[in-house]
Amino acid sequence: MNTTTPIFSKTDSLKFFRTLNSRVNNYFKENNLDRTGNWKLHLKTIVMFTIFLTPYFILLALQMPIWAYLLLNVVIGVGMAGVGMNVMHDGNHGAYSNKSWVNKIMGGSIYILAGNVYNWQVQHNVLHHTYTNILGHDEDLEAGRIMRFTKEAKWYKFHKFQHYYSVFLYGLLTFNWAITTDFLQMKRYLKRNLSYGEFKKPVIRWTTLIITKIIYFSIWLVIPMVLGVTWWKVVLGFLVMHYTAGVILSVVFQLAHVVEETENPIPDENGEIENTWAIHQLFTTANFAPKNWLVNYYTGGLNHQVEHHLFPNISHVHYDKIAEIVKQTAKECELPYYEFKTTRAAIASHFKHLRELGRQPQLA
């Protein structure tokens, strides 16, 4: 991870973001709307937690064949991803509610999804949203040697198969959160004195991490075993749950930034980025299936990543409305607005891009 901070240009001769901000602010003012969540988000919260937790209690209460047990764990995984995208995500961006304590509760749902609030806010809010698609700064591009997400990353022979094995690795996302990622990230972030908001003492961060991990594994592994579920069924179900959630979350994340159209800007020798932060988001981010109601609903507006990156503190329930404002403003300024009409088209572009990145680079 590169610790030299990139510097974005301060020159916006097009006045893109100033114009866009004014128009979006006018939209909320004219329609007398809060920028945070509303009753639609509150209802969706109930729906997503129901999908997530109801199968868990059924598994504890009833004896069932292995196929039914695993199927319910798939449903739990679907609900787990749904809670993460719709509830936890808005909460940790301060976009769920205009009350900070509500945001903390909703953001804290990450603890039963396998993650950690501090780590997520640093990786996502601080690093990813600030340095989007900049190798060495945006950790969403970091997958060790096994995946190559940018042309600047070192190439290995096995990368020519990455568009095949990537799906298997994507399924390990949340499992890794639970087992290793949180511990490695916390050590790294605390060493760099990184924080989103108040910087708390390391002992508080580590204590919170350890206690919440104990609670997490107690809920998903210990309690089912204590109540009589065979240990191997519990472990297998745990893996199925995580694989399901991991694939869903990874694919949704990748469709926003690792596709053919999006760019990976490189800082110059002075560490400077060519564009302003807002214009940088347009070049590095893409939407998909913006008119698909089900995709909009389930992904928590993460199919409107352009709007999310420009306005991370606005709840996703508003993205479909402000999207036209963003699109029109970008068009007027002759700036890109990347968008795939369908999820299928975005997925195809992602895996085609992985295949291209897996080819051996030609020597200059």
Whereabouts are the PLM-identified features?
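Short, charged cytosolic
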Residues: 3-26, 175-189
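Alpha-helical bilayer-embedded segments of polytopic membrane proteins, i.e.
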Residues: 36-84, 111-112, 163-175, 200-252
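Membrane-interface, cytosolic juxtamembrane amphipathic helix immediately N-terminal to a transmembrane helix
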Residues: 21, 25-43
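Membrane-interfacial segments
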Residues: 63, 91-95, 185-188, 227, ...
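C-terminal, non-catalytic macromolecule-binding modules
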Residues: 253-277
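Membrane-embedded catalytic scaffold of the fatty acid hydroxylase/desaturase
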Residues: 75-201, 269-361
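Glycine- and acidic
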Residues: 5-7, 33-40, 91, 106-111, ...
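C-terminal, active-site-flanking charged/polar segments
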Residues: 241-254, 258-259, 326-336
